[in-house]
Amino acid sequence: KTLQHKIKNMRKKSNFFHDNKPFLSLPNNDIEKGYKLLNKYGIEKKDKWICVFNRDPSYLKSFIKKDWSYHDYRDFPIDDLKGAINYFIKKNYFVIRVGSVSEGSLSISNNKYFDYTNSSIKSAFMDCFLLSKCEMFFGGSSGICLFTASFRKPYFLINNCPLEGIFSIKRIYPALFKRIKNLKDNKILSIREMVDRDLCNIFTSEGFKIKNVTNINNTEDEIKEFAIEALNILINNVESKDKSLNHQKKELFKSEIVRDSAIRNLEYENPIGSSFLEKTFIK
């Protein structure tokens, strides 16, 4: 069976996390152990932190017996998160970069930023601890998101690709997707054109090459704007209602994406970042 077919079968129980209570928790002694390790880096029990994550090829490259480059279309550099990270810090949150393996580092000279991925305390246990106690997860879509969802922590995803991935499971928090550019004329395609050219559910880098298109990462400014929206949702303890977004634009977006045969059978009501959608060409 094709990779795309396997992925669609995995997504059938799309409401699993949304409709069920948390099924993972850490015992008190492990929680105390986690706080003790964090304290070495100046993060105390009373402090609040946000976990950030960028997907890059380093993790899959660690599996040397297989070529994982077909996943490269999902990657983006950590530098694109710099504006969002500085915003979170300005709002008095610690920001912890998570991930078991990563490429590159971010030049932020602030003790509220902790690059856990390149630290001496990195472990499977600390991965779980940090995600279970964070205020929210903010970053790219990958397997690490399942841990966040398992602990029912708010998670705001960026650079989702393909577009179908945003609607794979039921979400109450908005997300951003990668726009698509036509290589022949460098034109950024509208949502309608993406649907018409069957570009919403391609799951390999080669698939995009065959279609003569490429993905465009969310810009640093777009990600920062989304960070502002995410924190507003978090602080006000409300689901995303996209109150500032024109209702007509939302309905127009929905009317176009449901033309895709796969998306119409998924959670197409899932919210998109308000500011991002306002700037997206629909038709």
What are these regions (language model features)?
Residues D79-K82, F125, S142, L146, ...:
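A structural signal for well-ordered alpha-helical segments within the folded catalytic domains
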Residues N39, K82-N86, F129-S132, I228, ...:
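Surface-exposed alpha-helical segments enriched in charged/polar residues
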Residues K1-K40, R171-K283:
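Leloir-type glycosyltransferase catalytic cores
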